[in-house]
């Protein structure tokens, strides 16, 4: 218990990053626990059989598109729509894990696999707003986290995305899992 309001304010200012990190971690763990209990078997089964990737997506993710090295799933909701993509590509260069390379790869994969509703329209990274790339360690392994905005070239859609990029050493490939709204 804090002795007074001023000490709470001072503590919060002094330990701002630690407090934010704590609440983010607690919320992430809550979401992980929920996804371990209830998840989309459609997504899990298709990713496991086609890309040899295990991923728990929310249970309401049922609509999907599956091609070689690319998987897309959505809750297909009229409001509160969420999408998930997973794609892989061969690991050939240590420079793969840079913001520039991953944005270029993302754009080429999305252009080929997520066309818009109008001819010639496609999804791409909105680089004018800036993209944030952060290397982290996840379960003892390197992971690149990219956050930014996407837009539909030739159409009027867009929103935020977060992607996690990891090296699959066993299969000599890079695996990207991304969520966007």
Residue ranges and their predicted role:
Residues 2-7, 83-88, 172-180:
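Short, well-ordered beta-strand elements
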Residues 24-34, 45, 76-81:
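Charge-rich, low-complexity N-terminal segments
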Residues 75-78, 149-151, 180:
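Secondary-structure transition/turn motif
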């Amino acid at each position: 218990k804090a002795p007074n309001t001023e000490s709470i304010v001072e503590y919060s200012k002094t330990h701002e990053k630690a407090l934010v990190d704590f609440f983010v971690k607690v919320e992430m763990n809550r979401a992980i626990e929920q996804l371990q209990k209830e998840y989309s078997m459609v997504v899990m089964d298709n990713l496991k059989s086609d890309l040899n990737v295990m991923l728990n997506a929310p249970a309401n993710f049922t609509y999907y598109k599956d091609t070689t090295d690319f998987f897309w799933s959505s809750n297909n909701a009229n409001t509160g729509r969420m999408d998930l993509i997973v794609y892989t590509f061969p690991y050939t260069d240590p420079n793969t894990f840079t913001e520039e390379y991953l944005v270029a790869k993302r754009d080429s994969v999305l252009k080929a696999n997520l066309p818009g509703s109008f001819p010639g329209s496609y999804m791409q990274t909105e680089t004018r707003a800036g993209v944030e790339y952060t290397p982290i360690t996840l379960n003892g392994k390197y992971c690149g986290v990219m956050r930014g905005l996407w837009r539909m070239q030739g159409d009027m859609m867009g929103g935020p995305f977060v992607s996690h990029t990891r090296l699959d050493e066993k299969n000599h490939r890079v695996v990207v899992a991304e969520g966007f709204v």
